[in-house]
Amino acid sequence: MHRFVLSIALILACSAALTSAADRPNVILFIADDVSWNDIGCYGSQTARTPNIDRLAAAGRRFDSAILTASSCSPSRSSVITGRYPHNNGKASELHQPIAAHLPWFPRLLKEDGYYTALVGKNHMSSDKPLAGETVQPPVFDFIDSGNAPGNRGGHATWVQTVQRRPKDKPFFFWFASLDAHRDWDGDKDWDAAKYGPKHDPANVHVPNFLHDDPQTRQDLASYHNEITRFDYFIGQVVAELEAEKALDNTLIMVMADNGRPFPRAKTRLHDSGMHTPFVAHWPAGIAKPGTPTQSLISVIDIAPTVLGLAGVQPAPTMQGLSFAAIFQDPTATVRQHAFSEHNWHDYEAHGRSVRSEGFLLITNQRPQVAWQGPADSVRSPSHQSLRAMRDEGKLTPAQADVFLAPRPALELYRTDADPDQLQNLAADPNYATVKARLSALLDEWTKATGDSTPEHLSPDSFDRETGEALRAKGQPTLRGTPAGDENDSSHLNAPGPR
């Protein structure tokens, strides 16, 4: 209780100081595409070359317990920009679906309060076009650009230019979203060794124990790490420009990813390999004890209220997250006790939920009869096809076989500290019956409070689960079922549930 009161006091003190200041903080949110938390150097990766992100962490705050709401591109990004759970964003709980048009995006609130706002790179949330019967949103961004240029289709080619060309009489918010490291490895095709250094050597990459260690998997991983290095390079270019303009001191920089790596047993998973995101914050004017990491749990729905609060802007009542501004002043501050995540349609029929709390992860699976093989681009990958060949020869380890497991357990329970890869399911262990009951009750409470549901008719598979090939001819529309929460009108519910 004492820590909670202290956290509130720190938030209020920080907000009061900022709202009375003439210069509110600038904010840049860098979002990597398909990058796992432990593939960044400052998180202990021996393969990664991420010197710029590592320097930001060394002089800022590395968050070791930042959790996504979905390990899927558009649902995850939609949660960040609205501060809401995927099923509370309307159809946006599923890939390639728009956010309900009545829900405000937090950059719009910044724009309306005097910030210059820009989105450069991958959007992948929705346009400003309304759903049928809904109203049109006011413009969210002053400037939108693909971030691409000849020889660089990674979404970051015009980041520095955007910084340079902004109006200098306004604070700014930039949503800088890279396409790195999404397949099909554009960085390999346009590699500039003068900028990024040598490509990663396949012989030196770390192969996770749930992948098969062979030449094609190693090359796949090396190409993936090349794209992470390119993402890091362009972050460094933006930081250098801010330093040259003497604008770095009062710019809050945050670096994160939308979901885990695009490999088997990562992207779309409710396990840490899918939901645990890297999250690094750097803000010389606003972070005390720089270089001290934090173990405090945060959810990405907390980003919107945090940024708005620091800017002196009232968060919208639709936002379900909590400000973690207190952690910038005190790395031991506690903001939330629980983090909830979802697995909905992403190329394949799916419905799973999870809650993280006090060192445990509980996963429920409402479609246990089918495998969690990952998204179609991962299924088509050399890494997945290598596993498939080993499966057919009967040579998979239990960790490698998990990607093909069907039926799956309907309930999974893990100790995240002792079992970081979540391979030892404790759901049937009587020693953990009390923990399982407590987390199950939390998940039930959250489901009811937020209006979540398990529709009878979910969106069906669009791709073959073995090959990743499309089940319908090119140009045919994707078949859609009922979104989670639709029967409860969950896009109009604002209750956050347990936090």
Regions found by a protein language model. Name each.
Residues 2-3, 10-12, 18-412, 420-441, ...:
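Formylglycine-dependent sulfatase
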Residues 453-465:
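Mature extracytoplasmic/periplasmic domains
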